[in-house]
């Protein structure tokens, strides 16, 4: 892999099967099936290669691997495979760096709410590395991602960096987008919308603003819709 996929990342993991008697592998990637313009041309002793520097958004990529033997000769190319990289979707960021030497290496993951919902990963310079249209609200210590997946109609759960659903709440069970977590016992917990009813607007610095809109805003009159949430725990297996 990857094979016949549209990726949402410019950091690409390549994997292939081990070849008999190979001591190394030569991997090439190109924007052409003729491989006359190479993104990468590198050797590795492993059957995986992570490329972080060669690709950009909206690239079309053909790639292939061949074994290298102990006498230095090359084997035949393994089947040529193809994938594409999708578009950037995060809103533009302005990153101000005051002292580059104080910035730790690593990536930052966050969710944006405007101008549309999206989550993504950026490097320390603000460059977009990975994105999804899902609403992410929690990452645990092992890097597992939780939130509201864009394909599950407001249901919540766990998904991976390949956009695959690992677990979701049952059909017809939307969640509050602010929080869903997996508990130490393996179960999942989140807030779900429970009831909407009219209630009072409590008095405060905002009172005059609500009164200007026609509300009594006296702390007594039931006139404003309030949403009640229910805290639910789901069994990992039976939901």
PLM region descriptions:
Residues 68-71, 76-239:
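Histidine-/acidic-rich catalytic cores in large beta-rich domains
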Residues 19-23, 113-116:
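Short proline/glycine-enriched turn/loop motifs at strand-loop junctions of beta-rich domains
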Residues 19, 53-57, 183:
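Hydrophobic loop/turn residues within beta-sheet-rich immunoglobulin-like superfamily modules
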Residues 10-21:
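Conserved aromatic anchor
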Residues 4-9:
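Short, solvent-exposed loop/linker segments at the N-terminal edge
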Residues 24-60, 68-81:
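Recognizes extended acidic, P/S/T-rich segments that occur
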Residues 1, 14-16, 27, 51:
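Residue-level signature of extracellular beta-strand-rich folds
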């Amino acid at each position: 892999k990857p094979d016949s996929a549209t990726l949402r990342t410019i950091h690409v993991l390549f994997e292939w099967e081990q070849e008999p008697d190979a001591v190394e592998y030569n991997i090439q990637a190109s924007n052409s099936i003729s491989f006359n313009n190479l993104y990468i041309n590198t050797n590795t002793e492993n059957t995986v290669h992570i490329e972080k520097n060669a690709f950009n958004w909206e690239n079309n990529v053909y790639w292939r691997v061949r074994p290298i033997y102990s006498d230095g000769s090359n084997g035949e190319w393994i089947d040529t495979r193809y994938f594409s990289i999708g578009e950037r979707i995060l809103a533009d960021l302005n990153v101000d760096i005051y002292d580059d030497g104080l910035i730790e290496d690593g990536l930052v993951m966050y969710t944006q709410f405007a101008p549309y919902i999206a989550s993504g990963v950026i490097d320390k310079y603000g460059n977009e590395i990975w994105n999804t249209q899902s609403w992410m609200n929690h990452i645990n210590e092992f890097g597992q991602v939780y939130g509201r997946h864009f394909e599950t109609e407001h249901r919540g759960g766990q998904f991976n960096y390949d956009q695959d659903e690992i677990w979701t709440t049952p059909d017809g069970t939307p969640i509050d987008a602010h929080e869903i977590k997996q508990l130490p016992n393996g179960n999942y917990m989140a807030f779900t919308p429970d009831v909407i009813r009219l209630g009072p607007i409590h008095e405060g610095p905002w009172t005059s603003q609500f009164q200007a809109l026609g509300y009594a805003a006296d702390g007594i009159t039931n006139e404003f819709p309030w949403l009640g949430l229910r805290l639910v725990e789901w069994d990992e297996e039976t939901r």
